[in-house]
Amino acid sequence: MQDVTIIIPNYNGKRLLENCLKTLEKQTYKGFKVLVVDNGSKDGSVSVTSEVLDMEIVSLTENLGFCGAVNLGIQKTKTPYIILLNNDTEVDEQFVEALLNAIQRSKQIFSCGAQMIDFKNHEILDNAGDLYTALGWAVARGKGKRCADYEKAVRVFSCCAGAAIYRMDVLQRIGGLDEYHFAYLEDVDLGYRARIAGYENWYEPEARVYHVGSATTGTRYNEKKVFLAARNTIFVIYKNMPLIQIVLNSPFILLGIFVKTLFFMKKGFGATYAKGIRAGICLSASKEGRAHKVPFAGRNLLHYCSLQLQLWVNLFRRV
């Protein structure tokens, strides 16, 4: 019996995908299926096979982005859990087993994220869960720091969807990834929605993943990435915060936009960032964007209050 479906979105990443699958073949836990959703690759990715894994490749004719590919995979999933895994990763032998054990500790746990380690330096972290602040910033916890300092399982704001397990029944209740994001911050939005509904997200250091990073986009900063991240920053705020919370956080949000504008001006992407912010405002004001806003429910009031306190506390946290 299979408990887990591992969904791997792929776009022109044949070599990366082959390496990722080789490490999945060595897992201590065998009760999983691999579903590769290919976003119209031109490099022969759909020809990749495995003689060991129970594996299926869904070949798309167009690039639906990370969110679209994942949601299509979710629609085809019949297992109680899914693992989202980037194609530019290689995993430890206990990766699946550790994530499954972690999420089964409590039915209140929606997701558990792996310890994502720098591919070139296995002593340095890439991600140990995500934090979110009143500035509207999502911060990769532990990035660039020693793995040895992040060996404790803890609750986090959200999990990086590059290597995390999710509970399917909760996904069906709160919805999958928002395809208006296309890519970037979609996992923060998903974790935020789960937190509003009263669920928890955890970091699990026993599940280890070695992450190349920016393998599909090619660089850490580029026009498309900066634009989407800026646009989605605004959309995450609009979607998940009630109006009174947006007003309460507005001084911090405006400060966050100002600081990021200066930062991207120095990188040569100031105009692109500003364009993304405008696009985020327009998306939030549109009929389509408004339809995606999380409806406020009085039963979730304590969850909103707890989240707001965390947004303030995270302003001063050393990640």
What are these regions (language model features)?
Residues 89-133:
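Conserved donor NDP-sugar-binding/catalytic core segment of glycosyltransferases
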Residues 59-77, 87, 98:
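Glycine-rich, basic loop-to-helix element that forms the pyrophosphate-binding segment
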Residues 124-125, 137-139, 145-166, 183, ...:
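A recurrent flexible, glycine/aromatic-enriched loop bordering the glycosyltransferase active site
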Residues 246-319:
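Non-catalytic, C-terminal membrane-associated alpha-helical segments of glycosyltransferases
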Residues 82:
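Short aromatic/hydrophobic "clamp" motif used to bind/position activated sugar donors
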Residues 22-31:
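Short, acidic, metal-binding catalytic loop of nucleotide-sugar glycosyltransferases
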